[in-house]
Amino acid sequence: MRYITYVFLLLSLTGVAFGATGASVTYQVNGQSYEGYYISPSDRAPFVLLIHDWDGLTDYEIKRANMLAELGYAVFALDLFGAGVRPTEMKDKRQHTGELYKNREKMRALMKGALDTAKSKGADIKNAVVFGYCFGGAAVLELARSGADLKGFATFHGGLKTPQGQNYSQTRGEILIMHGSADTAITMDQFTELAKELESAGVAHEMITYGGAQHAFTVFGGNRYQEAADKKSWKRFTEFLAETLNN
């Protein structure tokens, strides 16, 4: 994936086509700088918060944000690692994600800070859905368990395990899980266990599997990309947005 700074000129050109131009947003959470990406086609657009995978915020998330803006949604792609931190080595990716897995309160604070930043840019965070990929999917479920007042939580090939001592008793919005049944990183046993937890907690949820799809099946150009599963899951996600948000 290319770095976020590499694609801003291209993004400004593509944004003109649908009347919205995205921009980098530098913001602070607890004294540390973060760099997200915000795009909105109108002042009253429903809002979507996007959480990146373990590569950090790159052109992949920006492309997804622009795709949603074309459909009429305001999108803030947040940053969980820090301004300029876009790991490319496996050990660095594990380090940055591991730090947040070990410090769930920090993870929650960063997501809250991102929502506050989006609100300051004009986003309607009371009419909002959050979604994420891989590590970002795990963060989405962390936000759901925190009791965040959002209308929906969606994950693509995201982490599904619930940390010890946590549950979904405070979850407010509906949960949508999209998972590859050939994913060896996040197993079907974990998928099944999450289904049991959500059912027990009485959380409205929908969980979909895609046959033959491996982990990261939505990543364009990746060696595990599966076009059919990507298109089907994206279609279902956009339907979920239309069903969940006030347009």
Residue positions per predicted region:
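Serine-hydrolase catalytic machinery in alpha/beta-hydrolase-like enzymes
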Residues: 24-121, 221
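Alpha/beta-hydrolase fold nucleophile elbow
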Residues: 122-133
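Gly/Ala-rich beta-loop-alpha elbow adjacent to hydrolase catalytic centers
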Residues: 132-136, 140
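A conserved short beta-strand
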Residues: 149-159
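Short beta-strand/loop motif that positions the catalytic acidic residue
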Residues: 177-179
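Acidic catalytic loop of the alpha/beta-hydrolase fold
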Residues: 182-186
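Short alpha-helix in the alpha/beta-hydrolase fold that links the catalytic acid
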Residues: 187-197
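C-terminal catalytic histidine-bearing segment of alpha/beta-hydrolase fold enzymes
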Residues: 199-247
